[in-house]
């Protein structure tokens, strides 16, 4: 024990509105013509694996599902880009080139408004304002966010160094983020 306190928790919470009902995130998610966010998260019901499951033995397989009760599922609040607000916001998220989601899109033929597993998505920003408008994407383009490559690198460097100062990023990871920013196209 070196006597240092751990950093404050970054877990989503009700009391600071970083953990919310999925409908709030659905309504706030940026409008992107080719993206249809799920209307709700996957539903969650209690499952009974049998009387000795606490000892590590499942005697009911598949488990019995109690549909008389449904857990309330909450999700992290998102920023204007659709990226989660709570958590440790690495430079990928705090100086973004895309939106990262905890859900994936489904085809129009197979439940387009439903969640597909828990596989995430990477939704890159348009390069220019003209491309953004053509795509029907309300998120600012890369050119609108970062006037130059050097500006982008400076912002990544600042974000990475701040995480390092807070004890959340190793020195070698700061260097990796900066190198990746310099090589971003």
Residue ranges and their predicted role:
Residues 1-185:
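C-terminal His-loop and adjacent cap/lid subdomain of alpha/beta-hydrolase
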């Amino acid at each position: 024990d070196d006597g240092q306190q751990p950093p404050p928790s970054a877990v989503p919470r009700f009391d600071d509105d970083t953990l919310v009902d999925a409908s709030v995130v659905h309504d706030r998610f940026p409008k992107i013509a080719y993206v249809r966010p799920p209307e709700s998260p996957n539903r969650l019901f209690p499952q009974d694996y049998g009387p000795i499951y606490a000892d590590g033995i499942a005697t009911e397989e598949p488990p019995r599902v109690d549909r008389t009760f449904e857990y309330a599922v909450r999700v992290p609040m998102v920023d204007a880009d659709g990226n989660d607000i709570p958590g440790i916001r690495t430079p990928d998220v705090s100086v973004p080139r895309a939106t990262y989601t905890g859900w994936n899109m489904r085809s129009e033929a197979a439940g387009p408004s439903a969640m597909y597993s828990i596989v995430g998505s990477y939704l890159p920003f348009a390069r220019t304002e003209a491309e953004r408008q053509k795509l029907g994407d309300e998120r600012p383009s890369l050119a609108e966010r970062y006037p130059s490559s050097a500006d982008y690198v400076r912002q990544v460097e600042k974000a990475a160094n701040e995480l390092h100062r807070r004890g959340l990023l190793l020195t070698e990871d700061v260097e990796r983020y900066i190198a990746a920013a310099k090589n971003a196209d």
